[in-house]
């Protein structure tokens, strides 16, 4: 055993053999292979549990609190007084709880008087301990439940083991944690990782381009002019497109990921350049730079409402929903109209107008409904907390054409006419954005989006007729997808299928992209 303490494993000689065997034994026990674990302990003469940890476990589970205190005093040295006091506090709390639950009030008070000095507890801490016990759910009326008591003791043991210093106790499931950490490190360096499936331990992790949408699987032809906007619904079961032919189309995503036309929405008199799905996917908003805002029923394709007064030409450039699917907000390309919040019946709830409100380029509401992000024509991004009314302003140096929020609402991206996409954090901790480049944008409105597993990717259209994909860890393009013959105006990643992407182009088509071929060389 003494010699074994100095033996090492691995090609780098960094792994101590006795520690490696000990966590192997722990793993076998946790997986239920008790006989195998015991056999390994016998053969290696290396025990998973030390004498102190085994003794403590027995005392806790049997409720021998005096013995628990003694072993804890022995385990913690003078440099760990705070940790020792925390451990003793947990033990006394469980002890008092059990006495009070059984009705032994006098015994509980006696323990409190006797043991309080050990913890150097003042009146405040004693009062807190008493309150913790009296108001705990375990003190609810009813007979003493032995199963509950044993369960509470097991939980106490877990908490104590977190406090006990190494190597007396090994952290729970240590081998699983080490392996999982190693796998996660490999995943973090994998630019194509796009699946939550379990990974193989037989080889180092490395994904190919078959994990992301990089091949055209379907071309949708229904619009009669340029397609300016595309967006998957929140459930991923529908797709909406908007065109300069003055129509919008609702498409159905089938179970095999094929897409078919569901409704053509014909009521606009001018080009449609923006759509927005309600969070429950029952309603769709459509609008355009020279158009009014319209609300459609997704199931029937029927126009439910036209917002504003048509006679005054209340044009809307962008719109967004609140999480309840009953309120929406729209921004006008007319500065005098500003930003308006409506209900779905067309009643104005709130408006932001005045000289401080320039032309609205794009806007969005965070998934939690707490903040509204607005992009203005003066190169400003304003983030308004709708509850506190606190507003944060970000000034860009170049004109901004579009905005998109990540699925978790923590980040947003903006496309700039200088051929860059800027990634900002919503919390405002970053002083500078991450800048992604490689695509072409100088004359037209180009839109990008987050997508893939955990919003790990960005996709964007481009004036060179390509679709560009970046991994958030690299500001240079990961993939450049060819297929369209004219400017790609907008892209949308299916929020429920990380391997499905849609793109809309001036060539009057919508392309659906699926997983690429794993053996195809990268562009």
Swiss-Prot record:
Q: Which Pfam families match?
A: LisH_WDR26 (PF23627), WD40 (PF00400)
Per the database record, which ranges form the LisH domain?
16-48
Q: What is the protein named?
A: WD repeat-containing protein WDS homolog
Q: Which PANTHER family does the entry link to?
A: WD REPEAT PROTEIN 26-RELATED (PTHR22838), WD REPEAT-CONTAINING PROTEIN WDS HOMOLOG (PTHR22838:SF23)
A Gene Ontology cellular-component term: cytoplasm
Matches recorded under SUPFAM superfamilies: WD40 repeat-like (SSF50978)
- List, for all copies, the residue spans of the domain called CTLH: 49-107
Q: How does it assemble?
A: Interacts with RANBPM.
UniProt repeat feature WD, residue ranges:
222-261, 267-306, 310-353, 355-394, 395-434, 438-480, 483-523
The keyword 4Fe-4S is annotated on this UniProt entry? no
**Keyword Repeat attributed:** yes
């Amino acid at each position: 055993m003494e010699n074994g303490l100095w033996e090492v494993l691995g090609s780098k000689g960094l792994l101590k053999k006795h520690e490696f065997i000990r966590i192997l034994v722990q793993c076998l026990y946790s997986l239920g292979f008790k006989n195998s674990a015991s056999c390994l302990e016998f053969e290696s003469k290396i025990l998973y549990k030390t004498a102190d940890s085994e003794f403590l476990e027995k005392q806790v589970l049997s409720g021998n609190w005096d013995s628990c205190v003694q072993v804890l005093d022995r385990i913690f040295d003078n440099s760990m007084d705070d940790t020792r006091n925390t451990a003793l506090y947990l033990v006394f709390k469980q002890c008092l709880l059990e006495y009070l639950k059984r009705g032994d009030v006098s015994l509980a008070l006696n323990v409190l008087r006797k043991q309080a000095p050990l913890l150097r507890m003042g009146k405040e801490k004693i009062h807190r301990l008493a309150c913790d016990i009296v108001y705990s759910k375990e003190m609810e009326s009813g007979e003493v439940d032995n199963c509950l008591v044993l369960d509470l003791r097991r939980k106490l043991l877990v908490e104590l083991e977190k406090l006990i210093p190494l190597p007396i106790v090994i952290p729970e499931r240590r081998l699983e944690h080490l392996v999982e950490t190693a796998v996660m490190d490999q995943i973090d360096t994998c630019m194509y990782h796009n699946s939550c499936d379990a990974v193989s331990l037989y080889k180092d992790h490395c994904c190919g381009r078959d994990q992301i949408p990089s091949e055209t699987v379907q071309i949708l032809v229904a619009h009669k002019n340029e397609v300016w906007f595309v967006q998957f619904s929140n459930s991923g079961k529908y797709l909406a497109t908007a065109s300069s032919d003055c129509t919008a189309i609702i498409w159905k995503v089938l179970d095999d990921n094929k897409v078919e036309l569901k409704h053509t929405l014909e009521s606009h008199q001018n080009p449609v350049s923006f759509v927005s799905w309600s969070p429950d996917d029952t309603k769709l908003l459509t609008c355009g730079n020279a158009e009014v805002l319209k609300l459609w029923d997704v199931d029937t394709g029927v126009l439910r409402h036209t917002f504003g007064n048509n006679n005054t030409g209340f044009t809307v450039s962008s719109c967004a929903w609140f999480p309840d699917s009953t309120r929406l907000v729209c921004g006008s390309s007319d500065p005098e109209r500003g930003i308006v919040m409506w209900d779905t019946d067309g009643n104005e709830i709130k408006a932001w107008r005045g000289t401080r409100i320039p032309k609205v380029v794009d806007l969005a509401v965070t998934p939690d409904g707490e903040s509204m992000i607005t992009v203005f024509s003066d190169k400003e991004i304003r983030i308004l907390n709708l509850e506190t009314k606190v507003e944060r302003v970000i000034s860009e140096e170049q004109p901004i054409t579009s905005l998109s929020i990540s699925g978790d609402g923590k980040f947003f991206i903006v496309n700039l006419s200088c051929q860059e996409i800027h990634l900002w954090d919503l919390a405002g901790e970053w002083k500078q954005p991450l800048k992604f480049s490689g695509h072409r944008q100088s004359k037209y409105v180009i839109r990008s989006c987050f997508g893939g597993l955990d919003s790990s990717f960005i996709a964007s259209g481009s004036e060179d007729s390509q679709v560009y994909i970046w991994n958030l860890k690299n500001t240079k393009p990961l993939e450049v997808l060819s297929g369209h013959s004219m400017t790609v105006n907008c892209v949308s990643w299916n929020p429920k299928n990380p391997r499905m992407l849609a793109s809309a182009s001036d060539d009057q088509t919508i392309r659906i992209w699926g997983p690429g071929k794993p053996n195809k060389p990268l562009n």
